[in-house]
Amino acid sequence: MGRCLRNHSITYKTPKVPYERERFDAELKLVGQFGLKNKKEIQRVHYMLGHMRTIAKVMLMKDAKDPKRLLEGAALLRRLHNLGILPRDQNKLEFVLALKEENLLERRLQTLVYRKGFAKSIHHARVLIRGKMIKVGKQVVDVPSFLVRVESEPLIQLADNTPLTNPEINGRRKRKNNHAGKEDN
């Protein structure tokens, strides 16, 4: 038996106060609005945003002419612009501090599939993605939390091997009905 060589880094952090009415209500609203599976997905987004804010705060504390601030600050802003989390016209580190969870959740594949009209609901979008019926470019993506880059957004489409795009491929319900019809004969 070999060793597991996976990187087990922290992906989320639980809240310090476990039971807060206001936070519960806000999280429940986000879960319903974005079709999340559980609260851990919100905590993961919150952790990512906190990490980005921490980097921005450290860069803002440095001198404006500091080469490290210029380099790392530009890298952070470029990454956020490429992901579409931060609009192109907001190119200062102060705007990173004003980001909310909704900004990050809007860039998830699940949300974009629903917004583009491939799915009837946000939950149906999750089912399509987990069923490997959505591809970004040439790659089939089955992770609903996949963050879509701005240049990849127009490339979101239905996969070729699905009953939705290819009428020759029977879906599960159609196969079951065909099978039941053959037994009656």
Swiss-Prot record:
Gene3D superfamilies from the UniProt entry: RNA-binding S4 domain
One annotated GO molecular function: rRNA binding
Domain S4 RNA-binding as annotated: residue spans: 107-179
Alphabetical keyword list: Ribonucleoprotein, Ribosomal protein, RNA-binding, rRNA-binding
InterPro entries: Ribosomal_uS4, Ribosomal_uS4_CS, Ribosomal_uS4_euk/arc, Ribosomal_uS4_N, S4_RNA-bd, S4_RNA-bd_sf
Gene Ontology cellular component annotations, sorted alphabetically: cytosolic small ribosomal subunit
Any Pfam family: Ribosomal_S4
Region (Disordered) residue spans: 161-185
GO biological process: ribosomal small subunit biogenesis; translation
Listed PANTHER family: 30S 40S RIBOSOMAL PROTEIN, 40S RIBOSOMAL PROTEIN S9
Family statement: Belongs to the universal ribosomal protein uS4 family.
This protein's name: Small ribosomal subunit protein uS4
